[in-house]
Amino acid sequence: MSPKHILTDPCTLVVFTYAPAGLGHLRVTNSLSAGLPKGVKTVLLGSSDKGIEAIHKFISIHVVTRRLMEWFQRGRPQKIFTFFYRKYLRSYSDEMKRKIEEIFEQQVDIPKKVVIVATHFGLAHKIAKVKKEIEKKTGAKIILVVQVTDDTPQYIWYVPGADVIFVPSRRTMLELKEYALKSNLEKVKIEVLPYPVNPLLSKKLSSKDYDKRIRQVSEGTGEVIDFCMPVPGAAVGMDFLHHLIPQLQSKYSRFRFHIVCKEVPFTRRFLEEVRTFPNVQLHTSKHDREIVDVYDKIYEENVISFEVTKPSEQAFKALYDFDMRGGSVLLFSNPVGRQERDNLDFLRRHGLIFDQKITQRLWSYADDGKSMSGVMKKSLMTECNALRCFQLPFGSQRAANFIWWCLKNRVFECMISNYSNAAANSDFETRSNGVEQFWSKVSLLV
């Protein structure tokens, strides 16, 4: 039996955890689930901890609390904060223990091995606290696998008691290891794997669809240009999108916008207003899981060439090549929080996005309406043959002007024509097969 097929053993159960803290953790869970071998028994374990959801929204939306939280994410304040927050999370683990025990009770065949995949640190700490107790009670072997969902070495992601922690980069691995050593914490295995992007979107486009993507990013073709605009779970950035769409529509009437948004009270007004905009297709649901599914469906049923998004876990869609279903040009709004800046840093280190100096130079050209010389364009694009995304300037009007300037100056067209799959995938960290690697590694632990 091959390592991955060990997971299909009837006595093995895979449990995916889910926390109500934005859509990012669920997107990663969805990606991992999509790459499982057929025949694996799975269960989704959700948390009803409203505190996690409330804290996430409060910090994401309010500027003062966001800045305070960022202060706690660096240096000595981070170390102190992590110490107390970890204790807090582990002290409220009774509900998690009860839910895992219920999973055992609900199985017809009592599992002997249970793989629990945690994509949120809060749930990971709670599970780690009760893991040995449940093993003793059930006689089963529990393997706790933690997947870090941003390339951020925040200390709270170090989970004593986990069997393995997967991180997107060597940098994050080394910083977490150093923190654990200096803090005298229980040793946990940390491994670097490519970020687990959804394998369904790594499928190659047909030659017809790839040509369509090329036409969409090219100037003067008259093609309908499809944008995907996912609204974050905490609904950050709605005002930006609300103003960006008409700004773009005023420049070209054949832009088409696919907006993915959860239906909650604080998105109602946004949805009511953008519904009246021309060429806007709304994809909404009241349920997180449906929102994640509909996002994937948009890419599967359309040739999406641009995505305007936050540099959250969505930043790692840059691991798709342009000839893949999910390989749209990524256009990032202003980063919010340390983890989003860390994700942008990951992209810069690997040449998937321009550095700040070149980015600001391009912004300046767009602001002044200057044409980009052929020599400069060729030089930039030839040197940066792994380029996948751009950071947008602050403000919806400047962002719209920049996107239009890039189209008129054939920047996007040139970027794709000079793109090299080999260059973009030259480093292990930037490959799109992270899900396959994940399950191969997990199989060896079972």
For the regions a protein language model found, what residue spans apply to each?
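Nucleotide-activated sugar donor-binding and catalytic core shared by glycosyltransferases
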Residues: 1-446
